Amino acid sequence: MSNKSYDNNVNINERKTQKKFILTTTEGKPLKFNLKDSNSDIEIESEVSNNDMVDTSQHFHKNNIVMKTTLNDDINHILKKETKIDELSRIDQFKIIEWLYIKLNRSNATDMLLEEVIENLKKPKSEISLNLILRKREKTMSEKLKNLKEKKYSCLEIAKLQFNKVTLDKISLFSKEILDLKINTVDEMKELASFVFVKAITEKAFLDTYTKLIGILKKNFKCAEEKNMGKESTCFFASLLKLMMKKIEENHTFNRDIYIDKENKTEIEIEEEIENAELARKLKRTQAIGAISFCVSLYKNSITGVANIKNTVNFLTKKPSSENIELLCEILRQGGPQLNINHSETVNQILHYIETHNIYGPRMEIIIEQTIEKLKREIKLNNVSTKSSNIFANLFISNTGIAENGKKINEREDIEKYFEEEILPGLGSCYEIADLEDMVDIIVHGFNQFNQSEFVFHYFTYVVTDNKNGTKLIELYSVFLADIISNKDVNIFSIIKRIKNDLNIYYIDYPCSKIKYPEMLCFVKSTGKITNEEFNALKVPDFEIKVKDLVYKWHSTSDERLHAVFNNCDIDRIINAL
């Protein structure tokens, strides 16, 4: 290095080509280092005038050392780091040792590491080598909020929001907004496709809306990565089809019996485990049937051809099972008439298969029978004639029996529609028992409009299967309707007997019916519309266990209906078993 000293007024810009530098004091005198003299820093500092003004954009102080070279910025940056290291080195060594003893496990491997660390800490300060260890830092709340905000306004999240908001009458508007989004990667398109697929197979009421929107996006909805590849097909639509077939070709087991290990478990734990298993099974069934409906909907809206349906039928007919039979029936219910026009051989194949494999008990018999009746009725209404090659052509020939059955089916559908549109929405605004009185006129009107026995049967069916409104309906019957809708033409015992015979079906589709049905019996018995013998005949296994919550509620509120159903011995036994 050069021994030449530089004055404070030297223009650094004039020395850009020079690479030599020296360390000076603020007065421009060369700095002499004396590592043995611990007071050197203090002596240099005493020479500095308090009136000295330093341009911090060009100079940096560390112990009054000033860097004045073309490399001063880099050196000053290093000195800043050195200052931080000096501060770290002042940590109490004894506290570090104590912390290490606590944090490190005392195994053979960690003993060696601990001894080495302690030995280094005991060395003179100048001899310790400082190793910077990087560790994952937990994000602050502001950083987390920032990430959430960035995610919220990403194109992917906006696209999901559009699918959540879309309505059937505004599909063109939402499709334009989605197509204008600039999604970058294929992975984002796959994530969006997965999101849309789950909505399509679980939200049955909006399936047609989603299908029509998908049809618009089918060809042109591409991300930047896809556009660069120059592919004609879209990752979004291809992913939807792949997810659909994957769901259809699963090993479906949603109709199988559930086995619960009762060992070392309380009754409450067993009931909870059964309830969770039933909910999981119901979700699997909903998704499987939803995938079939989605496949048929794509065909009905001319978005895909019949190939996917044929592949589905071929797969489901390979291995007989009650689940596969139910899914085949779903194909006919959703798209039978449309398929019968140009692909009657596919309808013929499904009908032949479900007829020859109708061996899975009364539940599947009912499903198959209702499917065929619905198919006949829709084909007749649409004036579609079946080809002579269809071996089930005789199913679609009109006769008086079919007309009579069709009338009954239409009446059942009208009653269900009346409940869905007139009764159930009104129950949503009833929060107290007194509020239920407002619904009496609506229910009596329906009772007088339709077949009375059939109407009461549907009423009690909703009590058993509707988890949200079932309790309100039976309270309404018990308090206001029991005397109004009961007459010689309505046999309450026979109606509830019909429901009891279908409980195996309800247990699968509506797990809440396991509790709702026994509780309904208690409410009906409290009105005196069934005798003790009829009440006992309508009971199910573990009846008292299933009504214990209702008994406790009535007992704690001194409800008079409790003693109309049970005697004192029964009440004490049920209460003490809680």
UniProtKB/Swiss-Prot annotation:
A Pfam family annotated for this UniProt entry: MIF4G
Gene Ontology molecular function, alphabetical: RNA binding; translation initiation factor activity
This protein's UniProt keywords: Cytoplasm, Initiation factor, Protein biosynthesis, RNA-binding, Translation regulation
GO cellular component: cytoplasm
InterPro entries: ARM-type_fold, MIF4G-like_typ-3
Boundaries of every MIF4G domain copy: 156-378
Biological process annotations from GO: regulation of translation
Source organism, top-level taxon: Eukaryota
Subcellular location: Cytoplasm
Recorded family membership: Belongs to the eukaryotic initiation factor 4G family.
Assembly with partners or alone: Component of the eIF4F complex, which composition varies with external and internal environmental conditions.
Protein function: Component of the protein complex eIF4F, which is involved in the recognition of the mRNA cap, ATP-dependent unwinding of 5'-terminal secondary structure and recruitment of mRNA to the ribosome.
Name this protein carries in UniProt: Probable eukaryotic translation initiation factor 4 gamma homolog
Species name: Enterocytozoon bieneusi (strain H348)
